[in-house]
Amino acid sequence: MPKDCLLVVDSGYSHTTVTPVYKGQPIQRAIRRLDVGGKLLTNYLKEIVSMRQYNMVDETYIMNEVKEAVCFVSNDFKSDMERTWKANRKREEAQSVVVDYVLPDPNAHKTGFMRPHDPLLHAKKKKGALSGLSAEVLSEDVLVLGNERFTVPELLFTPSDIGMQQAGIPDMILQSLSVLPPGLHAAFLANVLVVGGNSCITGFMQRL
């Protein structure tokens, strides 16, 4: 029976769907869709960063690179939020959640990259205490990313965070199974196929 039952979770660019497949045929009445995909996550990150740091509204490609480099799905959202709040006071806490993303510099032929957050360096640059810093460091444009790293992909699981009246992925799965015979639930849950680019986000599979 399990080989006849397949539950496909597809989280791609435009949306996320849950589709039960029985003997090779999708069960149409049980398909569930969430209008959250990679595009929305990138746009949401872009909006947050533009409000808090640099204006990145027109930099969709760069912000997609940032998302793929730094974002993760939290398996303990409350704890990660608390660690982020403490980051300004305790360096060891900051290093566990907060990271720097050095924006690409096309003039110097440098691509963007993530590195551990250095609060002392950030404070120096913010205060204009630039003596002793290399020309390379001075020329860098850096995004400091803390709770953005996990609040953005959290929309896949809690879309109500941005006011969407739709179920997140776990509830979608339950809703999908609810219209199927109870005797088949275990068979579908024993054979889950997860596809789509968002499934590559660190922590996605563990959370699911």
Descriptions of predicted regions:
Residues 1-208:
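C-terminal region/appendage detector
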